[in-house]
Amino acid sequence: MEKMYNVGKIVNTHGLIGEIRVIATTDFPEERFQVGNTVYLFEKNSKKPEKLIIRSHRKHKNFDLLMFEGFTGIHQVERMKEGVLKIKETQLTNLEENEFYFHEIIGCTVVTTDGEELGEITEILTPGANDVWVVKGADKKEKLIPYIADVVKEINIDDQKITIEVMEGLLD
């Protein structure tokens, strides 16, 4: 089976007309959830994915609300709760130079320009102006590294290694 990537988790239904409430886990929800696009539903107790075509998409509070072709009522989508939406690897778009997908960054080892290993990126937060990488070290403590040019000096996806310049107070 082709490699697939998570783009969202279904947390609930919304209204009575077959909308579902999704927490996006993708870098590009507007692109991933575009009308006409295909996503694959992996339900909690099912091994086989269900192919779904997006009929509508809108933002509501912190959620993405989706409707799928062929689903017109709450009774048809209730079973999807707690399901995960994925896309195939072939659906990924090529990024510009120095742009990366989250799955390429998560798992990379972070080292300083002095060669000190800080740990592995376990999560990426998107609080606002720039992403923040959560780095867990051998001491199990989490360090927050902002993805900005002053800090991140080199990203080598092939070697799964990221070099950073430690600014004063960054690791305190």
Swiss-Prot record:
KW rRNA processing (keyword) present: yes
GO biological process: maturation of SSU-rRNA
Cellular compartments per GO CC: cytosol; ribosome
Main location per the UniProt record: cytoplasm
Molecular function terms, GO-annotated: ribosome binding
Domain PRC barrel span(s) in chain numbering: 97-170
SUPFAM superfamilies for the chain: PRC-barrel domain, Translation proteins
Tagged with keyword rRNA processing: yes
Keywords: Chaperone, Cytoplasm, Ribosome biogenesis, rRNA processing
Any Pfam family the entry gives: RimM
Family: Belongs to the RimM family.
Domain characteristics, as noted in the entry: The PRC barrel domain binds ribosomal protein uS19.
Name this polypeptide is given: Ribosome maturation factor RimM
Organism: Listeria monocytogenes serovar 1/2a (strain ATCC BAA-679 / EGD-e)
Gene: rimM
